[in-house]
Amino acid sequence: MPAALPYNVSRDNKWDIKKIIQDFFKRCDVPYQVIPYDTELWNACLKRAKEKGYPVEPDSPMSLYRSFKVGVVITRTSYGHIQDYEILIWVATFTAFVTYADDAFQEDIQHLHSFARTFLQNEKHEHPVLEAFAQFLRESSIRFSHFVANTVVSSALRFMMSIALEFEGQNVSVSTEAREYPGYIRILSGLSDIYALFAFPMDLPRSTYIQAFPEQIDYINGTNDLLSFYKEELDCETVNFISAAATSQQVSKLEVLRNAAEKAAYSYDVVVNVLKPYPEALAAWKSFARGFCYFHTSSPRYRLGEMFHDFEHDLVCKCASCTEI
């Protein structure tokens, strides 16, 4: 495809995206809101990380310092109903690790290739952040039940593999016959089972919510796809589920986006119905589901404030080669 000049995400397209998001929020009973940043949790996370010896130097490129900002936002917004402060620090720290990996290793995948091997063989990883992550994951078996620890470790290893797969496949055309491949990569990279699991208090019987897990995962994946789409278009990111699915299905990105929003809203309703006999689980789910939306509205990473509050000026795409929605 020939290179194009930088273009604005058009006003019409912005309104289309905004309308899809607004309809989704309405169906899931989520009024638009921005949650203030929790500096107390931020300080607690940095203090704990330093105690553990994790790299958190503010000026180092091999540091979790900036990634902790994302971890604190998702924890405060999505897990505000969780009373165990140690769990909040754990979720924020886990998110900091995976955010760092997702951002730092997009073009340096040799570390990702070696992570599972060094982890399973209990060897020291040469990258300080990944060595700290391995240490963090190994402690899961001490902190949590077998089910939780197994979920954490297996999902984290899949996630690291998915980053490498996405990088290796970014210059490979998506086949129109490979309809399920974008969804497969999405499942690998989503970490949705971990985030769904921690939505419930650890002392809540797993039997009260486990049957809703498939739809919880679909909700988390679909909501993230929906609410990260605007930012990805502005940044000309194409290695994502919406872009890959649009190519494989030979439809527009907006059509895939509408379908993702519809599936996420449907999944939300299914979870509510499954959890109705269990009031505590239902309350936890509703708080998490709303908070997961607020994670995206509250994080500058996703730029939704620009869409909902600043339609006065078109935002120019950052790269010189991109495609229309």
Swiss-Prot record:
Needed co-factor(s): Mg(2+)
Binding site for Mg(2+) 2: 224, 228, 232
GO molecular function terms noted in the UniProt entry: carbon-oxygen lyase activity, acting on phosphates; metal ion binding
InterPro entries: Isoprenoid_synthase_dom_sf, Trichodiene_synth
EC number(s) reported in the record: 4.2.3.-
Alphabetical keyword list: Lyase, Magnesium, Metal-binding
Superkingdom of source: Eukaryota
Binding-site residues, Mg(2+) 1: 102, 166
Keyword Lyase: yes
Functional summary from the UniProt entry: Alpha-cuprenene synthase; part of the gene cluster that mediates the biosynthesis of alpha-cuprenene and oxidized derivatives. The alpha-cuprenene synthase COP6 is the only sesquiterpene synthase identified in C.cinereus that appears to be part of a biosynthetic gene cluster and is highly specific since it catalyzes the cyclization of (2E,6E)-farnesyl diphosphate into only one product, alpha-cuprenene. COP6 is also able to perform the cyclization of geranyl diphosphate.
Protein name as annotated: Alpha-cuprenene synthase COP6
Source organism: Coprinopsis cinerea (strain Okayama-7 / 130 / ATCC MYA-4618 / FGSC 9003)
